UniProtKB/Swiss-Prot annotation:
F-box domain mapped to chain residues: 5-52
Entries under SUPFAM superfamilies matching the protein: F-box domain, Galactose oxidase, central domain
Top-rank lineage group of the source organism: Eukaryota
Protein name: F-box protein At3g26010
Pfam families: b-prop_At3g26010-like, F-box
InterPro entries for this protein: At3g26010-like, At3g26010-like_b-prop, F-box-like_dom_sf, F-box_dom, Gal_Oxase/kelch_b-propeller
Organism taxonomic ancestry: Eukaryota, Viridiplantae, Streptophyta, Embryophyta, Tracheophyta
Length: 414
């Protein structure tokens, strides 16, 4: 009996549709198949098709304590298909995580003059040259197009803080490195209050500070508009000056491209949770006001889900665990409590770091501000400054190791 081999020929359009349904980690491998496939995958059409197909899918993200410590990591999502937590791909044994913006990560060696910006999963890194004057890492901001794809980034470093107006206000002397020019520029920004803690958080091109000499306000500066040399002031919503009330706990976070202010207030009958979104006109919109069940106990808001403003993550001080709470469905789940939990099988929870971090924050009675390390919805290359060569992760590790060894030798010979 004769057996016939049949070859099925698929059109380019069908192949494109098939590719768009694969995780980015797999799609990246197809770029090396041929120049045609590489051109197709790097086209604007394919990029938009992929994002459209995966618009309801989450992407890998981690909740981190500034520095090197990973609290919670979500991976294995359909968008990237990572087998491990996002922080695994960052050479944290050698570098400190300073900031993140639209999938780009800013890391530094212990010497603030040495820092890198890159995508840890794509293993693409840009070495940022030192500024003219020694300064400390301040933040990472980025510029995106209408589809949310990164066009460029800026690294901001703090050179000097000048106290003004009899210790009421201050001026910041900063250096700004642009990926579009590859050079540092210097500028001075004026703040109407004293900044008591320079831990900041960023969204797009804007840096925000909330630890100020004046309670109940934020200050912000957009490094891409730069129409003014003044921080603008944003009053926090419904702020009754609970700064020293242990029943009041707040956090600044981001979700779905907006700054979010979330807070809890323990009352005799229930725990009240509120969430506001900062609109583009600097007004606050109340999204949630809801009583949470007493089974959660005395809890602290940690962060909103970066892609779903219905979901908040909370830390239970009484029971020492992280709760993922869906505000719309009223369902909650303790992360890491069930080994066979299908909804969170790709969730990494660092229990000791969670306890250490949240105990320190709660002990200081400060607002919670954790770093949301979020991969983008597309594997866009890191914007490369003019005449700068891209480095891979192995090269970064080798470079930093060599610097550390040289520093140790110089110290021993002093």
């Amino acid at each position: 009996m004769e057996t016939r081999n049949r070859t099925i020929h698929l059109t380019d359009a069908i192949w494109t549709e098939i590719l768009a349904r694969l995780p980015l980690r797999i799609i990246a491998r197809f770029k090396s198949v041929s120049k045609t496939w590489k051109s197709t995958i790097e086209s604007v059409y394919f990029r938009r098709l992929f994002v459209s197909v995966h618009r309801k899918s989450s992407t890998s993200w981690s909740l981190m304590w500034y520095g090197q410590k990973d609290l919670v990591g979500f991976h294995g999502c359909e968008t990237w298909g990572l087998p491990k937590s996002l922080s695994f791909y960052i050479p944290s044994s050698l570098c400190i995580i300073e900031g993140s913006s639209h999938g780009l990560v800013l890391i530094s060696e212990n010497d603030d003059d040495c820092c890198f910006v890159g995508n840890p999963v794509l293993q693409q890194w840009i070495k940022i040259p030192p500024p003219p004057v020694h300064s400390s890492v301040f933040g990472l901001v980025s510029r995106v197009d209408d589809d949310g794809f990164v066009l460029g980034f800026k690294v901001v470093k703090l050179a000097e803080v000048i106290v003004t107006n009899n210790y009421v206000s201050c001026s910041l002397s900063v250096f700004v490195y642009s990926s579009e020019t590859g050079i540092w520029t210097c500028k001075t920004i004026h703040c109407p209050y004293q900044i008591t803690n320079f831990g900041s958080f960023t969204l797009d091109g804007t840096i925000y500070f909330d630890h100020l000499s004046e309670p109940g306000v934020l200050v912000a500066y957009d490094f891409y508009s730069e129409i003014s040399d003044q921080f603008w002031v944003i009053p926090l919503p419904d702020h009754p000056n609970h700064g020293f009330n242990s029943d009041f706990k707040g956090a600044l976070t981001t979700s779905q491209g907006f700054v979010m202010y979330i807070r809890t207030l323990a009352q005799s009958s229930s725990n009240v949770f509120k969430a506001w979104r900062l609109n583009n006109d600097s007004t606050w919109q109340l999204l949630w006001k809801i009583g949470l069940p007493s089974l959660i106990g005395d809890y602290v808001p940690m962060a909103m889900h970066p892609f779903d403003s219905d979901i908040v993550h909370l830390w239970s001080q009484d029971h020492r665990h992280v709760v993922s709470w869906n505000l719309r469905t009223q369902k909650n789940r303790i992360l890491g409590a069930e080994d066979n939990d299908e909804d969170h099988k790709d969730c990494y929870l660092n229990q000791p770091v969670c306890e250490e971090c949240m105990d320190e924050i709660c002990g200081c009675k400060a607002s919670v501000r954790l770093l949301q390390l979020v991969l983008p919805r597309w594997m866009e290359s890191v914007p490369c400054p003019p005449q700068v060569e891209m480095m891979n992760t192995a090269s970064v590790i080798s470079y930093v190791t060599s610097m550390q060894e040289t520093m140790i030798r110089n110290w021993l010979h002093q």
